[in-house]
Amino acid sequence: MTQVRLSYAYGTSNQPLLGMTIGEKFDQACQQYADQDALVSVHQNVRLTYKQLQQQVNAFACSLLKLGFKKGDRLAIWSPNCVEWTITQFAAFKAGVILVNLNPAYKSNELEFVLNKVSCKGLVIASQFKSTNYQDILTKIAPELCQADNKVLNAKRLPHLKHVIKIDDQAHTGMHRFQDLLTAPT
């Protein structure tokens, strides 16, 4: 007979739990280290201080709420590591949205399964990963994206997905530009 082991050890500790959310702890760190580097992305040639990162996170969180995201809604991100990933992660925490991290190597059937399985309301996508074009894959699953003039998706195969946010400098039919959502008033 095998012995059952706990996946987490727990008990009393000298280190108390913090009575704050991740978003609150983030804001505390931003206030304490405002002018210090918070995020450096060498491959994107981007360097943000805590204050700059906080401004972008707050703007993106506000934009998510303006798009109709509510506490407990799911927002997926399908992208390799980048600055936008970090902004999305902290903005989701602050807006009360559950972030769903997708494997950047997913193919169409895997993407469709996961987005439906967890009822994702939104999807943040990069342009591509290696030789995989994310927009092409998404358009094959949800051809309605090309007709979503008001940027609210109603796709037969992805019924829960309403918003696609593209990490890109160009405007795309049916998609929000990530950069545009960083300029929202906080």
What annotation goes with each model-predicted range?
Residues 1-20:
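Flexible, non-catalytic linker and terminal segments flanking ANL/adenylate-forming cores
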Residues 2, 25-49, 170-173:
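AMP-dependent adenylate-forming
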